Amino acid sequence: TVRRSVASASPLKPEIIEGVDICFVRELTGGIYFGEKRREGGVATDVCTYTEDEVARVLRLACRLARERRGRVTSVDKANVLETSRLWRDVATRVAAEEFPDVRMEHALVDAAAMQLLQNPRAYDVVVTENMFGDILTDEASVLAGSIGLLPSASLAEEGPGLYEPIHGSAPDLAGRGLANPCGAILSAALLLRHSLGLAREAETVETSVYATLRRGLRTADLAGSNDTTASTADFAAAVANEICGDGQGRAIA
């Protein structure tokens, strides 16, 4: 979600990004990243494979999430040229029609989706796509918020615990310097509360505490403007913790 408090950090115009709220669902265990790879002489090959079950599993998750949001899913593929994408689109259409008739399913080619993401990001609610396309589109989407350090993620299975982490890498060049933005990590904890522990109110408390801290003009270096107070990683995290503990629900979390 792009909030007004950080809209100035985005390279896009405020009227384009304010209020943008997109949930990306990326398939993580299949596709070209996990296909057969070989190199012989001057020829290299990467094989992209998807099964109906793999596609149906991630589509069901996207549709369940859409039911909790605005009820719309955009399935992104390259069905005009790729056989795996044609399978993806067929399965997406069937799962939505047979199992989630209350969810509006739309299809988009990945190149058009990448363009629309910058021109009119409010057009999207839940975006679901295969592994490589999701890898690219989520990094592109980080530009909307102004910093990749703001964004959380969850790796979810149909059953069992999830894995929660910010979408950025380890950034070893920032280690020990107090420059990293902790928002992605803190908001990932909120996702854990909501999706693995079923604690929606507590998750909302964490999220609103992050946004309240940003509204006060406290920023880490990646977001700070001329009128903002630049905080270290530890100072920003402490300010969020104070917001959480200042709330009755927050004290219960602590």
Regions found by a protein language model. Name each.
Residues 1-2, 118-218:
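Glycine-rich phosphate/nucleotide-binding loop
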Residues 175, 196-254:
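Internal helix-turn-beta structural module
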Residues 72-79, 188-194, 224:
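Short glycine-rich or small-residue beta-strand-to-loop segments that form or flank ligand, phosphate
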Residues 82-93, 118-124, 142, 216-224, ...:
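Short glycine/threonine-rich loop-to-helix capping motif typified by GTGT followed
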Residues 1-45, 132:
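N-terminal glycine-rich phosphate/adenylate-binding segment common to multiple enzyme folds
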Residues 41-111, 123:
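Glycine-rich phosphate/diphosphate-binding loop of Rossmann-like nucleotide-binding domains
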Residues 12, 18-22, 29, 68-71, ...:
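Short coil/turn connectors at secondary-structure junctions
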